[in-house]
Amino acid sequence: MKIDATDAVAALSELVDAGFTHDFRIQNGKLVDVSAGLAVNPAEVTVRMKLRFETEPGSGDASNIYALEIADTGVKGFLVDAL
């Protein structure tokens, strides 16, 4: 899979179009599928892609986007880490 986006919002749109529709977040130290309201076993997670978008080169302001897939269910989604 190839993402052609040049910013985080466009990248998320492309990921959703590619079937990565679930929103994952870190809550209380656990990975949670917010869309399903369930904690996810980290051993079941595969990172399919990692993207990084900086607001200005060298500024330290960046967004990391991880495209994730859960092995036992096939659920695909994304985790956004904004620095």
Region roles according to the model:
Residues 1-83:
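Polybasic/polar functional segments that serve as interface/processing modules
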